[in-house]
Amino acid sequence: MTSTAAEGAGSGSLNPPHSNPSGDGGPRIRSPPGKGNKPVALADITNTGKPNAARSITVPDLVKENTKLLTLLNEKTKIIDLSRVEIYKLRLALQASKQQNLHLTQTNSQMLAEINTGKDRIKMLQHELSCTTALLKVKDSELDRKKNAGNVQQKGVKSQVLKTKASTVAVEAHHVGDSVTSGVEHHVVESQSAVSSNTVCQEPPQDGKQKRMPQRRRSSRLNQGSCEIRGVSQNTLHENPVVPVAPSTLSLEKQYGQTTGKHMKSLQNECSATVHEVIMASEFEKTEINELPQKTDLKEIPEACSSETEVQSHKIGDKAFNSKQNHLTGSQSSLSFNTVDTPEPPEDNTVKRCSKKRSSIEDVNAKLDTITSEPLRHEEKRKSRRKISARLNSVSSEHTDIVVETEHKDVIVSLAGSTSNVSMEQRTNQEQDGDCFSRKSNENQILGRRSLRRAAEKVVSYKEMPLNVKMRRP
């Protein structure tokens, strides 16, 4: 290295000898610049410059140059070592950065996974929340429906209990009014028979068209609370001018004094007392019904109402019919034989009416005790009484019906004020209970009556007739 450096330094410091172009040891002619390897011409030979003087190369110069080169080499080696250290440091930093990058990527991936799981969990929680809100709404609606249904059931039970109470009160009041009217009618018939003992009763010609309605329908009319009796046509009244007209209540008061009015007032007071007792009994029954559980079948209530109203109405109708038959037979005997009856004093009649009133009150109390316990027994009694009333209907005659109807008109007018309210209430109650009665008619037929025998109906399906059958001659 040193030899080469010295040679380089010597060559760099000294000018090299020019080459001789002629080749005989002399200075050579330089080729003109830019001509390359052209052959030397005469101009070039003749115009040659003077050669430079050769320099002398010394040893100290070479040593100096060598030392300079050594210093440069040392510096370069130092720079190389420093660069190596720096490169190593950079490699270490790169590795550390790579590791940090890996850690960061891992943490980033973990965070992203946690975020995704959190989002999914939020979605699930939102779905659960929506489902729970929907379930709560459904439960609230069900609770509201149950509350409304319970309120409706309570209202229906209350209304039906009120209807049953009103119907029972109206029926009992009508029964009491019927008993009172029957006593008054009996008194009027006796007085009229005594007055009209000397008169002659001419029977009207019986026509086939004017047939009397059955007594059964008449008893049903009395059950409705109306004391109306089928009136006689104007023709029959004009044809029978000899038939006596029943005296009014004013004439009775004139004949027997004002004792009858007092007795009527006492009877009305007793009627109001009995009605009050019936109302108290019905309220007691209402309290017992309210103590029952609210989940009772609502279908049993209208059936019981209809059965009770049927039993009471038929029982009252049968009693009214029996009393009417007794009055009819009494009046018929008095009119047919033209016997003279002495009128009884009003005190005996009032005693009779009081006894009848007491018996009717006892019947009312007995009914209230036996209606709920023995409904089937009442139905059997009603059937037997219906049969008896049907037999009695066949025996009664038309003429006695007409006479008694004309006799009862004035008495009914006098008592219409006291029984009009009861009749109106009972009519409305029976119109409301008509539907229940129509529903229970089939069940009553199955229980007590003979079942209807219907012919088997042949079911024929429609089929198209073939053409050859259509074209046949009849």
UniProtKB/Swiss-Prot annotation:
Task: Identify the species of origin.
Answer: Zea mays
- GO biological process per UniProt: cell division; maintenance of meiotic sister chromatid cohesion; meiotic sister chromatid segregation
Feature: compositional bias, Polar residues: 12-22, 190-201, 322-341, 422-431
Q: Which gene encodes it?
A: SGO1
Q: What is its main location?
A: nucleus
The UniProt annotation puts the region (Disordered) at: 1-53, 189-226, 322-356, 422-442
Give GO cellular component annotations, separated by semicolons. Answer: chromosome, centromeric region; nucleus
Signal peptide positions are none
Higher taxonomy = Eukaryota, Viridiplantae, Streptophyta, Embryophyta, Tracheophyta
Described by its record, this protein's role is as follows:
Plays a central role in chromosome cohesion during meiosis I by preventing premature dissociation of cohesin complex from centromeres after prophase, when most of cohesin complex dissociates from chromosomes arms. Required for maintenance of centromeric cohesion before prophase II and correct segregation of chromatids during meiosis II. Has apparently no function in mitosis.
Q: What is this protein called?
A: Shugoshin-1
